[in-house]
Amino acid sequence: MAPPPPSPPSVTLRTVLLLLRVLTAAFLVITVVLISTNTVTLEVSSTSIKMRFNDVYAYRYMLSAAVIGLLYAVVQLFLTISQFATGTTHPLNYQFNFYGDKIISYLLATGSAAGFGVSKDLKETFLALIEFDSTDPVDKFFSKGYASASLLLFAFVSLAVLSVFSSLALSKRPIQVS
């Protein structure tokens, strides 16, 4: 005799999961917009140099992590809304949620760490080479880098919380023997 199917999560838990997915996607959308529009023009000894986010490898990695995370968040939003509407969960969703949440959360964490590290190092380097103050465009460039890294960190935290829920859901799911 087959074991009974797992009981679906309560409406309150599903609502919390949906809100966390929306929050993750919102953080990632803002991160993508903020980092992809990050540019500065430097005037150094009558030479104009335009610096973009894609001139810094760590910012490119941060943007890539945010875009991949955003794609995953959108897919998960659709799956969560579907589960919310139907009240049922496909058996493969447990594993997809478990592994996806773990992998993408680590990707977001490393992207955030890269953004914080390069913002700190490059800002100190620029300050050592050229006299800048807090109103300078270079400072704003790196402040946007810090803001993007912070939002990516917030997205990681909300996805890490979702990862705990997906771990619990997978562990409570009965093992199916073929």
Curated annotation (Swiss-Prot):
Gene Ontology CC: one annotated term: plasma membrane
Transmembrane segments: 15-35, 61-81, 150-170
Cytoplasmic side: 1-14, 82-149
UniProt key word Metal-binding: no
Subcellular location: Cell membrane
Stretches in topological domain Extracellular: 36-60, 171-178
Keyword Methyltransferase assigned: no
Membrane topology value: Multi-pass membrane protein
Keywords: Cell membrane, Membrane, Transmembrane, Transmembrane helix
InterPro entries registered for this protein in UniProt: CASP_dom
Subunit composition and interactions: Homodimer and heterodimers.
Family statement drawn from the similarity comment of this UniProt entry: Belongs to the Casparian strip membrane proteins (CASP) family.
Protein's recorded name: CASP-like protein 4D1
Protein's organism: Arabidopsis lyrata subsp. lyrata
Source species taxonomy: Eukaryota, Viridiplantae, Streptophyta, Embryophyta, Tracheophyta
